[in-house]
């Protein structure tokens, strides 16, 4: 059985997709970009500011589904510029301290709304 998850405290999807889908014990979170859910605007600033907003959006979706950051098992990070990798990691480590999920980081030529970062995640909970 699958369930569509919608978090009020996360940005509304900007296309024909769901914020997240719960399938069994898994939660599949769609790629999140640094949109402030209160204003609907892209967070201006450097990679650190954008990474923080993306992770706050993911956290809000997790919580709406009854999950937490410690339940995240896999993350894919899409970066506009791999030179931002170290700075992104500084913020990322604040969110995933001891509970580090498996992860891939990929440089891409362009992201929606010309943001610097997009992150998607998969969580699992017994």
Swiss-Prot record:
Q: Which parts of the sequence are marked as the site Stabilizes the substrate? A: 17
Against InterPro entries, the record matches this protein to: RidA, RidA_CS, RutC-like_sf, YjgF/YER057c/UK114
- In the Enzyme Commission scheme, what number(s) does this protein have? 3.5.99.10
Tell me the keywords, alphabetical order: Amino-acid biosynthesis, Branched-chain amino acid biosynthesis, Cytoplasm, Detoxification, Hydrolase, Isoleucine biosynthesis
Molecular function, one GO term:
2-iminobutanoate deaminase activity
User: Which biological process terms from the Gene Ontology are attached to this UniProt entry?
Assistant: isoleucine biosynthetic process; response to toxic substance
One GO location term (cellular component): cytosol
Q: Where is this site: Important for catalytic activity at high pH?
A: 118
Question: Where is substrate annotated to bind?
Answer: 103
**Which Pfam families did the record assign?**
Ribonuc_L-PSP
Record's subcellular location: Cytoplasm
Q: Which reaction does it catalyse?
A: 2-iminobutanoate + H2O = 2-oxobutanoate + NH4(+); 2-iminopropanoate + H2O = pyruvate + NH4(+)
Q: Say which domain of life the source belongs to.
A: Archaea
Please name every pair of cysteines joined by a disulfide bond in this record.
none
Q: In which pathway does it act?
A: Amino-acid biosynthesis; L-isoleucine biosynthesis; 2-oxobutanoate from L-threonine
Q: Provide the primary localization.
A: cytoplasm
**How is the subunit organization of this protein annotated in UniProt?**
Homotrimer.
Family listed: Belongs to the RutC family.
Record's function text: Accelerates the release of ammonia from reactive enamine/imine intermediates of the PLP-dependent threonine dehydratase (IlvA) in the low water environment of the cell. It catalyzes the deamination of enamine/imine intermediates to yield 2-ketobutyrate and ammonia. It is required for the detoxification of reactive intermediates of IlvA due to their highly nucleophilic abilities. Involved in the isoleucine biosynthesis.
Q: What is this protein called?
A: 2-iminobutanoate/2-iminopropanoate deaminase
> What lineage is on file?
Archaea, Methanobacteriati, Methanobacteriota, Thermococci, Thermococcales
